[in-house]
Amino acid sequence: MINSKTKLLGLIGHPVEHSLSPTMHNEAIKDKDLNYVYLAFDVESENLKDVVNGAKAIGWKGFNITIPHKIEIMKYLDKIDNDAKLIGAVNTVKIENNKAIGYNTDGIGARLSIEEIIGEVKDYNILVIGAGGSSRAVCCELAKNNNLTIINRTVEKAEIIANDLSNKLNNAVYYGGLNHNYNMANFDIIINTTSLGMYPNVDNKPPISMQNIKKDAVVMDLIYNPKETLFLKEAKEKGCATINGLGMLIYQGAKSFEIWTGVKPDINIMKNAIIDIL
């Protein structure tokens, strides 16, 4: 029940009307019997600074940041977590002692989603398709303990991420273009971070051949609408374990929830809340 002691959490983005986050977080709040509420706010870029200052002034506990504000928000924060600095984007802000502190939980969300299937993600050969914002978050997390190759239509974008991570993590990260004929048997985990195959363009997929993919490979697509992309269907036909983007969405949200409240939410509660409305 909302009262004068209810703590405020939220989502800042533009647009936000189709977001699954309020449903997911409010179910987790209800399950843990916490006096919080999570709301979505459609905010234009020119109002971001005012939102951060206002959130501190009225005592918000924190908020998520989504498209298109994940980079711009950084200039208005008092402190930024090291992983978020490496990624170059923030998706979670905690308000503490009148300070706005930025985090990025996207990469952690991807890793935990994969670990549901195979356990600890360490010492694997991983192929990441795409070099956008989501790719950077995933790569920053997975490059710490794995052998990473990033491929992208514009090779220079993949090169930038690979060089950044190689320099900052002291771990070689490889890169290439989409027109190369890659031996898929070399990879244990393959992740599509592009929008190819997302609704309504469900007949699209990354131009990657599954011909000699390992049967015990794990194939992940960050897309969750549709729940099974053409990319995942082809991988499943080859005997691979497949993961859509729902797990990443849930786990990144769960990590944000824990950062704000100090409480670990029930993953299944969050998952069922989303499945019920999809």
From Swiss-Prot:
It catalyses: shikimate + NADP(+) = 3-dehydroshikimate + NADPH + H(+). GO terms for biological process: amino acid biosynthetic process; aromatic amino acid family biosynthetic process; chorismate biosynthetic process; shikimate metabolic process. NADP(+) binds at G130, A131, G132, G133, S134, N152, R153, T154, V155, E156, K157, L222, G245. GO terms for molecular function: NADP binding; shikimate 3-dehydrogenase (NADP+) activity. Shikimate binds at S19, L20, S21, T66, N91, D106, Y224. Pathway: Metabolic intermediate biosynthesis; chorismate biosynthesis; chorismate from D-erythrose 4-phosphate and phosphoenolpyruvate: step 4/7. InterPro entries: Aminoacid_DH-like_N_sf, NAD(P)-bd_dom_sf, SDH_C, Shikimate_DH, Shikimate_DH-bd_N, Shikimate_DH_fam, Shikm_DH/Glu-tRNA_Rdtase. Its EC number is 1.1.1.25. The active site is at K70 (proton acceptor). Keywords: Amino-acid biosynthesis, Aromatic amino acid biosynthesis, NADP, Oxidoreductase. SUPFAM superfamilies: Aminoacid dehydrogenase-like, N-terminal domain (SSF53223), NAD(P)-binding Rossmann-fold domains (SSF51735). Homodimer. Involved in the biosynthesis of the chorismate, which leads to the biosynthesis of aromatic amino acids. Catalyzes the reversible NADPH linked reduction of 3-dehydroshikimate (DHSA) to yield shikimate (SA). Belongs to the shikimate dehydrogenase family. This is Shikimate dehydrogenase (NADP(+)). It comes from Methanococcus aeolicus (strain ATCC BAA-1280 / DSM 17508 / OCM 812 / Nankai-3). The lineage of its organism: Archaea, Methanobacteriati, Methanobacteriota, Methanomada group, Methanococci. The gene is aroE.
